[in-house]
Amino acid sequence: MKIIKAKDYEDMSRKAANIISAQVILKPDCVMGLATCSTPIGAYKQLAAWYEKGDVDFAEVSTYNLDEYRGLSHDDPQSYHYFMRENFFDHINIDLNNTHVPDGSNPDAAAACSEYDKIVAAAGYPDLQLLGIGNNGHIGFNEPDDHFSKGTHCVDLTESTIQANSRLFDSIDDVPRQAYTMGTQTIMYARMILVVANGEAKAQAVHDMCYGPVTPECPASILQLHTNCVVVADEAALSLCK
């Protein structure tokens, strides 16, 4: 696991965007796994700015997002499909037919998850998987548990995750209680993993991810076993990594 220290959120975003753009430039038809938390927004904005300048071209890129709230349709303003269009896809030249997010509107969890696993596998899995990390060490919506998950599955969100995500909703009561998410096994199939983290609230999770025991109690700790994982984090998020 390689750790790149950034001064602050803006520096973290630019460093992460540099890695992502390098992947696109080196392999224009690359498969990208994308994250839908708030941490990567700065990187998405930087990539969109570079696209506007003609520095990077997303025309041949295909993307597969980690997760989606169960029960939300693609056009729901709180859905991650909507989030990706608002924060990234609508600002670059990507073919929307090549963008993929789990179908949160499908009430049949088993069918929705199985279908998403099939399309990710058919794409050959991501060349680069972008991840954020939750305060409790979750990646995607893989919450702390007594075992690591495999493929895409339906999860009950923990109270800490519901609380953390409530800032994006009018009320905590509006936050969905379940989500569809890629499993840790699927994430680990990516050829490169890029984790972004910022802020003091992430410090313990980042420390446990990088230096703690590999345990499903901190799902991100499994990334220690990946052969090509890069962590880009600001000084606050790395404050416990001495």
Regions found by a protein language model. Name each.
Residues L26-E52:
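Glycine-rich N-terminal segment of FAD-binding domains in flavoprotein oxidoreductases
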